[in-house]
Structures are given as C-alpha cells and as structure tokens.
Swiss-Prot record:
Mg(2+) 1 binds at residues 90, 222. This is Anthranilate phosphoribosyltransferase. Pathway: Amino-acid biosynthesis; L-tryptophan biosynthesis; L-tryptophan from chorismate: step 2/5. Catalyzes the transfer of the phosphoribosyl group of 5-phosphorylribose-1-pyrophosphate (PRPP) to anthranilate to yield N-(5'-phosphoribosyl)-anthranilate (PRA). 5-phospho-alpha-D-ribose 1-diphosphate binds at residues 78, 81-82, 86, 88-91, 106-114, 118. It is an enzyme of class 2 (transferase). It comes from Pyrobaculum islandicum (strain DSM 4184 / JCM 9189 / GEO3). InterPro entries: Anthranilate_Pribosyl_Tfrase, Glycosyl_Trfase_fam3, Glycosyl_Trfase_fam3_N_dom, Glycosyl_Trfase_fam3_N_dom_sf, Nuc_phospho_transferase. NCBIfam families: trpD. Its cofactor is Mg(2+).
Length: 329
C-alpha cells in the first residue's frame, strides 16, 4: 500500500488492480484519514483515469449489499454536482422507461447539488427508502421498477464519509457511485457533470457494462433539451463518440425546467410526469428515450421520445410511480 500511495504522490496513475487494492483498503477502514485524504486529493488534482475508477467500482460492487435480480434491468444515474437546479430527470426518466416496457433498478442518493436528488424525490412521493434486496428484486420482476437507496446498499462508504465531508471538492467516489448499482446491471444511462468524465466513465463502461450511454448535456449530467449533448455510446466493449441535438428526438430547443425551492422541484417533476407542464414533460421524455434506447425497447431516439410522450400522456408513467410507492411499503 505504501508503494501505491507513493505512486499517487508522484503524479503516477494506478492500474486497475492497484486502484482496486487501494479502494478495498479505504472501504475496509484499513487506511487512516490522513492517507485517505492524501490519496483522494492526489487523484483529483491529476484527474482520475478510467483504470482507477474501474478498480474502485470493482471494489465497491464487491462489498455492496447485492440485489438478486432474476431479470435483466437497466439503471439511469448521474454523477450530480452540476449545480444547474434542474428537476431530477434521471429518476423521472427511469419511471417513464419502466412504464414503457423497460425493467429498471434505479440506484440513487440524496442531492449532490440540486434541491432534489433521486432519494429526495422518491421519499417526497412516499416511497420507502428502506426497501431491501429481495423486495427490490421482486418489484423489478413484477412491476418493472424499484428504487434502491445507496447508503442502504453501500454501508462501507460510511467509512470514508467523514473524509469526503472535510474535502472541499468532489472525489473519485462521486464517479464510482453511479457505476456501483447493487443489482450489477449491465446496461446504464449515465450522466456526467464534467466533460472530462465522458471518456473516463466511457472507459469504465467499456470494461464493466454490456451497453451504456454516457452523456454530458452542455453543463448538466442529463440529456439536454437546450442544446447539444455529447455522448459516448458503449456496446460490446466498443465505444463510439457523437453529439445528440434536440432535433434527433424530433423537437426544437426547449428550456430545461429549473426550480428554486424543493416544493417547486417536486411540483414540476410531478406535473411533467402527468403531462401537465410542457418543458418538464419534454425533458423527461428525452431522457426516457435514451433509457429506452439503452434497454433496446426502441431502435432510435426519435422512436423513444414518441413512446415516452405517449406513455406520459396516457397516464401510465404517473400510475407506475404510484404503483412503485405502494409496492415499496
């Protein structure tokens, strides 16, 4: 471990195995806080590599409480931290995708920068955040959707929480979280809040996932309706980079819905899910389209958008949310 820490201090990046060993030591409580802070700071200052994040994700998955999925499912998650104040589109898109035929094990936490993170929203609508692994697996199988609260499934992260709170910047664990789904899903829509993370997370996805879309939407960790979204698409270990425009979904540029209070955020989210707020509905449908594409429910983004809008306007999306809330209790 001393040699690994020295490599980091000298600005040298770690390979997957070294990063795995470092993460395992951190998550087991084997490193003191000073060493943990030094390692996380060195990685952040240099910029975390795909190999390092892959090693950390492997370790996090290994020690997680597992959801014993019996069917194939997807996840929609973002790194958060974009500070854009948008409603929680990844969660809403997951609900719409589930209502439209995908199976989704949504993994999330409380807010990183906005008013409502995934867990904040699900809790606000009455979902039981303490849903256990067997229950979550059953929900995905029977109703196509379950939300799993990250701290419930990653108790080892509590060991590094005090250090993370003391550091004035985001660390590798903010990148690891969205990739550490406890159901070990093989398909994901992943939003990143920094352009540099497109290739980093894309590299991790190439190793650990069968299919993924990694998206950076002009400053937000979602597919943007306001302008271009940079994408790394991973399929069978190969990565392709391209740009999505709103026109690829059959729409023009549309403002992303933003909120200034928690109450406004949840109100906008529910209005969008019911088709009662145009900007929110479009933003949710665009991100649901990307999720449906990853799940291979649709062949392209335009078809995905049309299916998502239809699902919202027929009331199926809101009914799916209420069904999940009831099933969680």
């Amino acid at each position: 471990m001393v040699n690994i820490l020295k490599k980091l201090a000298n600005g040298v990046s770690l390979n997957i195995d070294e990063a795995y060993l470092l993460s395992r030591e951190i998550l087991s409580g084997g490193l003191n806080d000073v060493a943990v802070a030094a390692a996380l700071t060195a990685m952040r200052c240099r910029g975390e590599t795909a190999e390092e994040v892959t090693g950390f994700v492997k370790s996090a998955r290994e020690v997680a409480v597992k959801v014993p999925l019996r069917v194939e499912a997807i996840d929609t998650a973002g790194t958060g931290g974009d500070g854009a104040g948008t409603i929680n589109l990844s969660t809403l898109a997951a609900v719409v995708a589930a209502a439209a035929g995908a199976r989704v094990l949504k993994h999330g936490n409380r807010s990183a920068s906005g008013f409502f993170g995934s867990a904040d929203f699900m809790e606000a609508v009455g979902y039981n955040l303490e849903v256990g692994p067997e229950k979550a697996a059953e929900m995905v199988e029977k109703i196509g959707f379950a939300f799993v609260f990250a701290p419930r499934y990653h108790p080892a992260f509590a060991k590094v929480a005090p250090v993370r709170r003391q550091l004035p910047f985001r660390t590798v664990f903010n990148i690891v979280g969205p990739l550490a789904n406890p159901g070990l899903v093989k398909r994901q829509l992943i939003g990143v809040s920094e352009r540099r993370l497109l290739d980093v997370v894309g590299g991790v996805a190439s190793v650990l996932l069968d299919r993924a879309l990694v998206v950076y939407g002009s400053g937000v960790d979602e597919v943007s309706t306001e302008g271009p979204t940079e994408v790394v698409e991973v399929r069978g270990g190969r990565a392709e980079r391209y740009v999505l425009e709103p026109e690829d979904f059959g729409i023009g540029k549309t403002p992303l819905p933003r909120a200034s209070t928690r109450e406004e955020a949840v109100g906008l989210a529910l209005a969008g899910l019911r088709g009662e707020h145009r900007e929110a509905e479009i933003a949710i449908a665009v991100n649901a389209a990307a999720a449906l594409y990853v799940a291979e429910v649709v062949r392209d983004f335009r078809d995905g958008f049309e299916l998502a809008v239809k699902t919202i306007r027929e009331g199926a999306a809101y009914r799916k949310l209420r069904e999940a809330v009831e099933a969680s209790r």
